[in-house]
Regions:
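Contiguous surface segments at macromolecular interaction interfaces
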Residues: 2-6, 14-27, 53, 61-120
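Short coil-to-beta transition motif at edge beta-strands of beta-rich domains
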Residues: 34-46
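A domain-level signal for caspase-like cysteine endopeptidase catalytic cores
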Residues: 166-186, 190, 196, 201-204, ...
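Short acidic/histidine-rich active-site segments
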Residues: 380-393
């Protein structure tokens, strides 16, 4: 059986202005690729909008003979539009030519296919409540309850005795790895190993585990003080991080309903960069975000605040922008706003932003109340760093996230942009995602 090859196919500008049932390619190209088999996987690429459509499983024998009677050098291949022509952001790096074909490898094919799946399919939502409590005999009892609201109602409930000492041992090893490595390439197998232990401890019920891994979903976590520190992003099954198919949202059941934001310019973004001698790549990060906005012709206005802040300066920015991107140092008890001020939490916001992206270390620490306070104040989505992040090491995640979020011709939410960015970078970083998704998806 011949291997099915995968391709990106270009058409011309006029093709995408109408609903066409055929792809046009030169006969000479068809003759070359048909040697490898009659079936190919293909995406359609629109250069003007930097969008990719598909995927199509194309039978090269299924030609539109009525059109192929023309005496020109083109063949017309019938297609079925699998995904209703909703495309994802994509930049073709090779020289663009109309009616051409570019071969891609299997890894690229599945990455692009997964991205289109995400954009075009409804995402399952699961609310997951988890706690560790003492029974009358003083034993630790682990409890969880899961309620899935889409695509159908599904409820799972479980409780059992919990070996807290074993968990502490696994968590201690997680912290050791987290603090000693900025890139997970060397330690990915160790993270998967301890993630597999945690999965067996936390989700022991096989039927529910299989259900959880069936399709892409967002799992909204509601955790008590004993389970908040569980590193959900490293949970692993079958030698893979389950975060490859699941976004764990650290919501603690706050801010599930949208906020009524008043007097807010929804096309404004602020970048807060706190000056520090040890942060040398902030200018590069700022330039990348600005270049994304220019390249995509987005109407977003971006203001830069490259200075130290006090509490009131910081709150003023939060209340006047729809997106706030923060570049600073993170500590176990908060983020640095100035040399003598660490921000641990905020109080109420009159006009909260839709999205706050905190590019700082250690945002997962239990003593750091900033994430939870932002969500409680009405911020829809907070994306935050986990563990030790070397300066500038994950800039490609940030670039991919905003490229997808700001794409003028594709309306996607923050969860979809987060996951598409993960698909982009996971082949370069073997480890788990080093940015957490907190809150609920938001359109900006």
């Amino acid at each position: 059986m011949k291997e099915i090859k995968s391709y990106i196919i270009t058409q011309n500008k006029e093709y995408f202005s109408k609903n066409s049932e055929c792809i046009k390619l030169k006969n000479s190209i068809i003759k070359k690729i048909i040697k490898n088999g009659n079936i190919i996987n293909a995406f359609l690429y629109e250069e003007e909008k930097n969008k990719l459509y598909g995927y199509y499983e194309i039978d090269l024998n299924d030609l539109d003979n009525s059109k192929n009677k023309n005496k020109d050098d083109f063949a017309y291949i019938k297609i079925t539009d699998n995904y209703k022509r909703r495309g994802i952001y994509y930049k073709l790096n090779k020289k663009y030519i109309d009616f051409s074909l570019f071969e891609i490898d299997d890894k690229t094919f599945f990455k692009l296919k997964n991205g289109l799946d995400l954009l075009n399919e409804n995402i399952s939502q699961t609310f997951f409540s988890c706690s560790i409590e003492k029974d009358l005999d003083g034993n630790d009892i682990f409890k969880y309850k899961a309620i899935e609201t889409y695509p159908s109602l599904y409820i799972a409930e479980y409780q059992k005795k919990f070996d807290y000492q074993a968990y502490k041992s696994v968590y201690k090893e997680y912290l050791r790895l987290l603090k000693t490595s900025n890139s997970e390439n060397d330690n990915s197998q160790k993270f998967i190993e301890i993630g597999s232990y945690l999965t067996n401890m936390i989700i022991p019920e096989k039927e529910f585990r299989q259900h959880l891994l069936n399709g892409f979903r967002i799992v909204y976590l509601h955790l008590d003080e004993n389970t908040y520190n569980i590193p959900w992003e490293i949970l692993a099954y079958d030698k893979k991080f389950i975060s490859e198919k699941i976004i764990f949202s650290y919501t603690n059941a706050v801010n599930i309903l949208p906020n009524d934001m008043k007097n807010k310019n929804n096309n404004k973004m602020a970048i807060i960069s706190i000056p520090d001698d040890n942060i040398k790549n902030d200018k590069n990060e700022i330039e990348i975000i600005n270049s994304i906005k220019l390249n995509l012709n987005n109407d977003m206005n971006i203001d830069l605040y490259r200075k130290e802040h006090n509490y009131f300066d910081f709150i003023k920015v939060l209340e006047n922008y729809d997106i706030v991107h923060i570049i600073t140092h993170g500590y176990s008890n908060g983020i640095k706003l100035s040399e003598d001020y660490i921000l641990n939490s905020i109080s109420a916001l009159e006009n909260p932003p839709s999205l706050v992206f905190i590019n700082a270390c250690n945002m997962e620490e239990n003593d750091n109340k900033l994430i939870q306070s932002l969500l409680s104040a009405g911020v829809m989505t907070v994306i935050s760093g986990t563990g030790s992040l070397a300066d500038g090491i994950y800039i490609d995640f940030i670039e991919s996230f905003y490229s997808n979020l700001f794409h003028k011709h594709t309306r996607i939410n923050t969860a979809q942009a987060y996951y598409l960015a993960y698909l982009e970078i996971k082949e370069f970083y073997n480890g788990f995602m080093r940015y957490r998704f907190n809150g609920v998806p938001a359109y900006v």
